[in-house]
Amino acid sequence: MDLNGDAGAKRKRSSIVPAERPAKHLKPESSALTPGDSTPANGTVYDIEDEDDASRLLPIGPAQADSPEWQATIEEVVKSVVSIHFCQTCSFDTELSMSSQATGFVVDAERGYILTNRHVVCPGPFWGYCIFDNHEECDVRPVYRDPVHDFGILKFDPKAIRYMNLTELKLQPDAARVGSEIRVVGNDAGEKLSILSGVISRLDRNAPEYGEGYSDFNTNYIQAAAAASGGSSGSPVVNIDGHAIALQAGGRADGAATDYFLPLDRPLRALECIRRGEPVTRGTIQTQWILKPFDECRRLGLTPEWEATVRKAAPTETSMLVAEIILPEGPADGKLEEGDVLLQVNGELLTQFIRLDDILDSSVGQTVRLLVQRGGQDVEIECQVGDLHAITPDRFVTVAGGTFHDLSYQQSRLYAIATRGVYVCEAAGSFKLENTLSGWLIDSVDKRPTRNLDEFVEVMKTIPDRSRVVISYRHIRDLHTRGTSIVYIDRHWHPKMRLAVRNDETGLWDFSDLADALPALPPVPRKADFIQLDGVSQPAASEIVRSFVRVSCTMPLKLDGYPQAKKTGFGLVVDAEKGLVVVSRAIVPYDLCDINITVADSIIVNAKVVFLHPLQNYTIIQYDPSLVQAPVQSAKLSTEYIKQGQDTIFVGFNQNFRIVVAKTAVTDITTVSIPANASAPRYRAINLDAVTVDTGLSGQCSNGVLIGEDGVVQALWLNYLGERTPSSHKDVEYHLGFATPSLLPVVSKIQQGVMPELRILNMESYVVQMSQARIMGVSEEWIEKVTQANPSRHQLFMVRKVDCPPAGFDNMADTFQEGDILLTLDGQLITRVSELDVMYDKEFLEALIVRNGQEMRIQVPTVPTADLETDRAVVFCGAVLQKPHHAVRQQISKLHSEIYVSARSRGSPSYQYGLSPTNFITAVNGVPTPDLDRFVKEVSKIPDNTYFRLRAVTFDNVPWVVTMKKNDHYFPMSEYLKDPSQPCGWRTVSHNKSKHKDGIAPDAANLNPDAMEQGYDGASDIEPEAE
């Protein structure tokens, strides 16, 4: 299914390429860049189509000094203009979760109403604040967002502004005229205040099309040359009298000084209704109209008689309203047709959007009569006027990690489809379909239809945890193609099914629990058989098929810098009786996860993590073999190291999960360390002998084995997660072989029922050749010993980096230093990586090294690996906090605290105020917080919706202070704690027990791992494999 094309909307295509299209003027939140940081832009950019006629622009020359009249006007206007900083906390309808800046202006100083754009007020959960000209700040909440037109109204408390006299701008929509000189006063380009001048060139422009996001329609727009940019959305367009005559909405993004303003007729009506305490009625017949000039209308069949009548009644008019899109199943379906020219409504000659809106808004639930001309024939129809608010979603449901609501009128109009269906606005968790964040329509779940949100909820209530059900779906961009998938319903990491309903009284979205999760059904043993390899001449390859299982790992939270929420690959069964499987740690990076194993492409069973190797990129997992009635075979692992030039058989799995076989030879065995990821430290293999082979299949296959003719496995073929490239922001993945003898000691202990408690040297090394070693002070005697001990590779190991000790501990004197050349450990000459294995069982090792040209003996401590794995995570204000994991200690020289920011959610306070991943938190409100316990204690004292100070240190050792506002409503604090007594191995705890008395962490959009970023270059671009 191709989901990367343009929106399939029924509208004319612009000849302008997307890069040249205009855009809305949101200013992506800079996230208060930390010293030494380069936090990415995180707003949403909207491209819009353009229908400019260059001959109609009235560009202005270089800015001249304003006249005294304009200066006096601006001095008064700026007192009413505010800078709005806001977030949409979760994806909803046309918008993704985001943080951004825009502009608004006070339109009622007594009641505290601010007018701004609808794309600022947001269709979904909103939180934000505004800053006045004198830098006073106050919270704002939404009062009204129009279902169609690009305006909304925010409310603030006038009593909160104590140091300036509030003033308001009068709305005067009838003062907008072609040739009028105007000023756009706002937060242009994210600046506190910018004043841009321009001249109105058009009053009859059709509403700009903003691509696949929100777009205004059924209104005319005003066009001017003002050159506004990001952050000016919602700015007042004022005339010399100081009256607001339009609302800044969008403009060209290609550098042309062209801007688009919304007329204020409908905002003025909405404001007056709100002032009177009346509902803002909005009527619709689910039809999009556009303005077309008389010459086009004549081609559509407008008769000369009607043209003469219209021109006589409205001499200044040059265009008429023409039906562009009629939604199926809407009031006008089967009555109006595309291309109908509107003549009259209720007997009144009508050529303008404003009057059409007037009639429809005052006729909700009533019938209107429309006279249109179709191909030269008069056609009169009657339509029932529907309620526009009724087809605009004001609620959503979160379940199994995904977020859903009824399909909106905005999306229906964009794609010309009926306004019904269940829309996936946040495709995550169980409902992450085909690596697309949103846009799915769910047709059925578990073979039951889901025509609307209520039906979907009722179906989901009946599905037990850990069930696998069939869902049928389509993407809104490609409704011709129906997809069918089997999804794994996760109700243990996401136990609550929660309903959020918009509350226009409070400006918040109220959450309620719909149903608890049904417990998982007990697993049932299944039978299966393995495939037979046709045409494969190597019997050993045919046998090894029975030792492979497919492994799928899903992470409910991003930890340890791992960039994905789901990964799939293959593992090798090393003990079929005990259900032990070895898999790459690039597939199972940590144990806060769900693991599903597929045996013989038929049987699916759950598995758990048994062992994570800290250095060599493998994880051992275990499934219940009693559930698998299939001839699974334990792979035989070689006890001898594979050698360069040795013949071998490569057996791997390609990108289609199909097994491939090739007879080949070992080209090289090289000591490597996977490159570190600069933007966000994450697990990587180091001090590793990597096997490469002479076949092109090795690069295509991420998992497999190298086996001999006797069927003995000589090496595992694993994928290794590497660095992210600065240019493409894509993660590099290496495919290398790992010799099995290094695996045997760990597997043997686990088979004996003993959990390996390895110890490691806290350093990373790399190979030095004898020419380098000689220059660095290694004696000829030792060089001779090296050549005799390892005839195939004359090498020693130099310390590249020493791991940072825990916070509060200084580097110990008797340990390695960068640049040390290692000669022996406990008297054994070290020329191979495998010889470093002596470190695993000893607390101290006696090392002979060459440092600064001098031989010396030191006693070096080893580090217990049990302390390196993450066992706790705190989610606070959208930031995932954890103890610095091993990769952090490998890449940093000093730990500033035990509180490391691992990730943050879009639309959260952490995102808004710039608490970036890879930062360390050292204090809260001046109180030192060296560890998570102290941090949780201090932040628990902070009341909701209150500012507090965090002292932080960047990864590059630059201290700074961030001020944040706590938001417990959308981002309550919760914890993930490792607990072997729990079925998942972890438990969740909420610190917001006043609202969640059961103590279980709430299922909230801020815990969606796909909405989290982990480094200053954003989220991963590696696409997870399709199931």
From Swiss-Prot:
Chief location of this protein within or outside the cell: nucleus
Enzyme superclass (EC): hydrolase
Enzyme Commission number(s) of this protein: 3.4.21.-
Entries under SUPFAM superfamilies matching the protein: PDZ domain-like (SSF50156), Trypsin-like serine proteases (SSF50494)
Entry keyword set: Apoptosis, Hydrolase, Nucleus, Protease, Repeat, Serine protease
Stretch list, region Serine protease: 81-265
GO cellular component: nucleus
Record has Protease as a keyword: yes
Subcellular location(s) of the protein: Nucleus
SMART domains: PDZ (SM00228)
GO molecular function: serine-type endopeptidase activity
GO biological process: apoptotic process; proteolysis
Keyword Protease: yes
Record: active site: 119 (charge relay system), 150 (charge relay system), 232 (charge relay system)
Stretches the record annotates as Disordered: 1-46, 991-1027
Domain PDZ: 288-373, 875-956
Polar residues bias: start-end ranges: 31-42
Pfam families: PDZ_1, PDZ_6, Trypsin_2
Function: Nuclear serine protease which mediates apoptosis.
Entry's family note: Belongs to the peptidase S1C family.
Record protein name field: Pro-apoptotic serine protease nma111
